[in-house]
Amino acid sequence: MNFLAHLHLAHLAESSLSGNLLADFVRGNPEESFPPDVVAGIHMHRRIDVLTDNLPEVREAREWFRRETRRVAPITLDVMWDHFLSRHWSQLSPDFPLQEFICYARKQVMTILPDSPPRFINLNNYLWSEQWLVRYRDMDFIQNVLNGMASRRPRLDALRDSWYDLNAHYTALGTRFWQFYPRMMAQASHKAL
């Protein structure tokens, strides 16, 4: 899962959206640095990552990547799941339009920015103003995201080529998303994540 899915599942679970978004920028035990609700959100994010990586649908999708891109498949798939969520938001969350959800999420996240790591602050400078969560629905933007990550982290250069795997298996990836994501939504609503 990437930014949008973590925020969405956190909302459904009535968990801290701030903590769920912040989690990838926090190493180790967060309990001494953040309030309890944010810590709970960080832990939820980590559980979702482990759960998602071990889903049979996700394990199967990783196998569709070529040998030279399989190492970065988990990262690529996380971004792709956000693509499908953004693209199909109105079906998955018909009572909360995406733009309204984004405003709601941003307000929550802004409350923790003053005490956040610099990299997280930097992310927030772009995430909201450049409308990433809406733009995830566009596959050209997904390609730009993967290229950007590869540029910032040279050891992840294979992300550039992983775009071809997404394109080659687009329909099958969409099918897998619809198989697992509604289940995760139900788990979140029942606070079982």
Swiss-Prot record:
Q: Kindly state which reaction or reactions the protein catalyses.
A: holo-[ACP] + H2O = apo-[ACP] + (R)-4'-phosphopantetheine + H(+)
Give one GO term, molecular function aspect: [acyl-carrier-protein] phosphodiesterase activity
Keywords, A to Z, come to: Fatty acid biosynthesis, Fatty acid metabolism, Hydrolase, Lipid biosynthesis, Lipid metabolism
The broad enzyme category this protein falls into is hydrolase
Biological process terms from the Gene Ontology for this record are:
fatty acid biosynthetic process
Q: Which InterPro entries match?
A: ACP_PD (IPR007431), ACP_phosphodiesterase_gpbac (IPR023491)
Known EC number: 3.1.4.14
- Domain of life per record: Bacteria
Residue ranges of coiled coil: none
Alphabetical list of NCBIfam families matching this protein: PRK10045.1
Function according to Swiss-Prot or TrEMBL? Converts holo-ACP to apo-ACP by hydrolytic cleavage of the phosphopantetheine prosthetic group from ACP.
UniProt lists the family membership as follows: Belongs to the AcpH family.
Query: What is this protein called in UniProt?
Result: Acyl carrier protein phosphodiesterase
Organism expressing this protein natively: Shigella boydii serotype 4 (strain Sb227)
For this protein's source organism, the top of the classification is: Bacteria, Pseudomonadati, Pseudomonadota, Gammaproteobacteria, Enterobacterales
* Originating gene: acpH
